[in-house]
Design a protein with these regions (language model features):
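Cofactor-binding active-site loop characterized by glycine-rich and histidine/acidic residues
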Residues: 27, 35-167, 185-191, 196-199
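Cofactor-/ligand-binding subdomain signature composed of acidic, glycine-rich
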Residues: 1-39, 61
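A short, structure-level motif marking secondary-structure boundaries and short turns
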Residues: 13-14, 144-146, 180-181
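A short, conserved beta-to-alpha structural element at the edge of catalytic cores
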Residues: 167-187
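A short alpha-helix capping/helix-coil boundary motif
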Residues: 6-9, 33-34, 138-141, 173-176
């Protein structure tokens, strides 16, 4: 990596600030769930704070992200305000989806968070659709599809990458590989050492 490819100090500090916010919120989520204050499905992103932090500092406010049920940290990094996010998780009408989406379906278009989906692998074709719409409008927006390593083993992954390549879509695919697809270790479910090799 050349010197000019290195992020500047201000960018690094913003990544660190976002990662710290994600870590603090993850700790709070786990604390309130353990205490029984909130009863909800929650998939911790502990140890993955840098990924959405580094991605989000390189996006514009109106760029899109489509994330998965494990993506609360992606939404926070993109800029979803904490008060309506927490209200959503608590099922309150002041939430981002009026309390009807819950933790697995956070949406906040003002921050560019178009959908959080509970269906494994579905973030990729949805992000492609948003990217294609942006391309047709010529508005310069970029879409990001977050997904896990398990989703890289389903058809939607291959179809989405093929479509993005074919149409030269302004879309970025971000695999957050935590080493497990539910309970299956990465090496038992994927035949390549690096998911990026499939692209």
């Amino acid at each position: 990596m050349s010197q000019q490819d290195q992020p500047d100090r201000q960018t690094l500090l913003e990544i660190y600030r976002k990662a710290t916010l994600l870590k603090q919120n993850d700790e709070r989520f786990r604390s309130v769930i353990k205490a029984g204050v909130l009863v909800m499905p929650y998939y911790s992103a502990r140890g993955q704070e840098i990924i959405p932090s580094a991605v989000s500092v390189n996006l514009n406010q109106d760029d899109y992200i489509v994330t998965i049920y494990r993506g609360i940290h992606d939404s926070i990094a993109k800029g979803v305000p904490l008060k309506p996010l927490w209200a959503e998780l608590a099922g309150r009408v002041t939430g981002t989806c009026k309390g009807k989406g819950g933790p697995m379906h956070v949406t906040h278009p003002a921050s560019g968070v178009m959908v959080t989906t509970g269906i494994v692998g579905s973030s990729m074709p949805i992000a492609n659709g948003l990217a294609w719409a942006s391309q047709l409008k010529g508005d310069g927006k970029v879409s990001v599809a977050y997904f896990g390593d398990g989703a890289a083993n389903i058809g939607a992954f291959h179809e989405a990458l093929n479509m993005a390549s074919l149409r030269e879509l302004p879309v970025i695919f971000v695999c957050q590989n935590n080493g497990y697809a539910v309970h299956t270790k990465y090496q038992y479910g994927t035949g390549v050492a690096n998911i990026g090799d499939r692209a």
